[in-house]
Amino acid sequence: MQSQKIRIRLKAFDHRLIDASTQEIVDTAKRTGAQVRGPIPLPTRKERYTVLISPHVNKDARDQYEIRTHKRVLDIVEPTEKTVDALMKLDLAAGVEVQISLG
């Protein structure tokens, strides 16, 4: 496994949650002897929604809502068998989406 690279992409709505999960992954990988690049913050996606709060006319009465999707990328350059086993057993927070790819 010395020539492979593991890329981990994380997505979450709460930046504190994604930062804690990223730090937990980095600590686990470094503890098992792997080299880590990142975390690299990717652009935050902001989705805005405008809702009319008036039941009939009055177009000036509106509420605006926004949801932000925070993203991070980690590269584990030299994964060992211990690194892969430790990452598989790692229990992350419920609000974080994890996507793992080998390359």
From Swiss-Prot:
| Single biological process term from Gene Ontology | translation
Per UniProt, the keywords (alphabetical) are: Ribonucleoprotein, Ribosomal protein
In the record, what terms sit under GO molecular function? structural constituent of ribosome; tRNA binding
Q: Which InterPro entries match?
A: Ribosomal_uS10, Ribosomal_uS10_CS, Ribosomal_uS10_dom, Ribosomal_uS10_dom_sf
Q: Which GO terms describe its cellular component?
A: ribonucleoprotein complex; ribosome
Q: Which Gene3D superfamilies match?
A: Ribosomal protein S10 domain
Concerning PANTHER family, the annotation shows: 30S RIBOSOMAL PROTEIN S10 FAMILY MEMBER
Q: What does this protein do?
A: Involved in the binding of tRNA to the ribosomes.
Q: Which family does it belong to?
A: Belongs to the universal ribosomal protein uS10 family.
Q: Spell out the protein name for this chain.
A: Small ribosomal subunit protein uS10
Q: What is the lineage of its organism?
A: Bacteria, Pseudomonadati, Pseudomonadota, Gammaproteobacteria, Oceanospirillales
